[in-house]
Amino acid sequence: MTVIQRSILIFSLIFISLPQGIVKANNFYKEAVIIGGYSDRDQWIGKKGKSLKNSIGFEYYRKFANDYGDFLTLDVQMRMAYDSTEDSQDAFGIEVHNAWAEHKLGLGRSIRFGHFDPAFGLEPVLDTHGTLLQTLASKNIGFKKDWGIAYKGLLGDYDYEIASQIGSGMGIKRKDGSFLLTSRIGTPQTSEFQYGLSFLYGQTLQSSQSWTIPVSDLVSGKSVRKKRIGIDMQRQLGLFDLKAEAAAGDNDGRTVAGGMVELGYTVPEQQNLKIKMQTLYWSDDWDEKKARDLTLAPVIEYKISSSATMRLGYFHDIYSSSDEDKLILLQLYYFGL
């Protein structure tokens, strides 16, 4: 067991054993993802991806307060996942998504440490943990979460966050000088029209799987130097909601860029039914046409209850850096007490 893995175990024990007298909120959520579909390329499939495998898990969330209000928030979210595309001995693993503590310093300032979103783009302000449609994060940074420390504060009417992380994503390892520095400044999440500006600099690793335990093998032993600037926005327009982001920069000197636009519509006669359309583009080498991905994805989402949601999506690759594909996915997602 590595030093970092031992630290996570100690953190979890402390997390659970903190005194109950100062608990303001204490919730234990259960989670399940059942997903499958049909692909032109692979025929009947489970979804091979960074966060959409079949899985069961939980989220344990606690908030602590004193006479002056809440001062500490702790969150652990993990799941046992199954990847049907792997051999039996490699098909199961544990994904630690959230494992962080955040301490309020007052005046809108706080400090966070653990496993959390890098401060870049839409991912820190959206919950895409169990959804079919994803942000640019996995293609842009290479992962959605990383291990490290972050500081949040206020700059006039804007929120800002600065994060320093180890550049490994889900896995708990550093190699070849990996690190990740990110920052984002944007409007408060309570605003009807939200927008943000982000910056990124680092050397990141790419894992062959998204497991935290066991630690996945690296695709390459060398880290990739990344520089990015990005913009993002969200806007509620009556029954419509619009999300968009774009990022550009370089990977080891190669120009990279991409964008995502997503439009959602809530059916007025059936508020539990939502229709979404997403276009996502990413190029890992702007000068090489074969390095680009462009996917169109309409998704129908129906909320069965406050805890269960059914999603049906069609993903059509217009361009792909690997083999172009068309696939239909059906997902049942449960998240409740």
Regions found by a protein language model. Give the residues of each.
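Outer membrane beta-barrel
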Residues: 26-35, 46-167, 177-179, 186-194
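Transmembrane beta-strands of outer-membrane beta-barrel pores
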Residues: 34-42, 55-57, 62-64, 78-84, ...
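Outer-membrane beta-barrel "beta-signal"
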Residues: 324-337
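Detector for outer-membrane/organellar transmembrane beta-barrel domains
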Residues: 70, 155, 186-287, 334
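Outer-membrane beta-barrel architecture
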Residues: 57-61, 99-102, 150-152, 184-186, ...
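Transmembrane beta-strands of outer-membrane beta-barrel proteins
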Residues: 27-36, 70-76, 109-111, 160-162, ...
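Transmembrane beta-barrel architecture of outer-membrane proteins
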Residues: 95-97, 166, 179-181, 201, ...
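Solvent-exposed loop/turn segments connecting transmembrane beta-strands
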Residues: 45-50, 68, 82-93, 141-146, ...
